A protein has these predicted regions:
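Short, exposed beta-strand-loop hairpins at the edges of beta-sheets
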Residues: 105-108
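Conserved short histidine dyad/triad with adjacent acidic residue
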Residues: 40-43, 47-66, 100-101
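Short acidic-glycine-tyrosine-enriched beta hairpin
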Residues: 85-101
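Short hydrophobic/aromatic-rich beta-strand segments that constitute the beta-sheet cores
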Residues: 63, 81, 115-117
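Conserved catalytic-core motifs of eukaryotic protein kinase domains, centered on the activation segment
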Residues: 84, 110
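A short, N-terminal "cap"/entry segment at the start of jelly-roll beta-barrel domains
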Residues: 1-48
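A short hydrophobic beta-strand segment most commonly corresponding to one strand
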Residues: 111-121
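Short, conserved beta-strand element in jelly-roll/cupin
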Residues: 65-81
Length: 121
């Protein structure tokens, strides 16, 4: 990708929008809606850094060790994260949060979530 400043758009690429993705294990969806969409605006040459926009239908997943460092900004929807010690935090539209790599948590999307993300492997 070219090195230049760019705007992250909440609907993905203006020409193609967001595309189906499969980051979420199918068995974790909590309804018949298994929709998941993504658009990556930036990927470093080795893909150790990614930024984009992602959307998922409601799901609940126990994560033993979060696989990346990730900063997120919620565009719409809601997600509740529960740490290994039982502390829960709910994030909604406009909230910005960070999950360090290796974090044990429960990821519970209670209504369709759309977020901007920046990932560092």
């Amino acid at each position: 990708m070219a090195n230049k400043v760019f705007r992250l758009l909440s609907d993905g690429d203006p020409a193609t929008g967001m595309q189906p993705s499969d980051f979420t294990p199918p068995e974790t969806f909590t309804s018949d809606d298994h929709r998941e969409l993504n658009h990556t605006f930036f990927a470093s040459a080795d893909e150790s850094i990614l930024s984009g926009v992602w959307e998922s239908a409601p799901c609940k997943e126990e994560i033993e060790s979060y696989p990346v460092h990730e900063m997120m900004t919620v565009i719409s929807g809601s997600v509740t994260l529960t740490n290994a010690d039982g502390q829960s935090e709910t994030f909604t539209s406009g909230d910005v949060f960070f999950i360090p790599k290796g974090t044990k948590c429960t990821w519970h999307i209670t209504e369709t979530l759309r977020k901007f993300y920046m990932i560092a492997a």
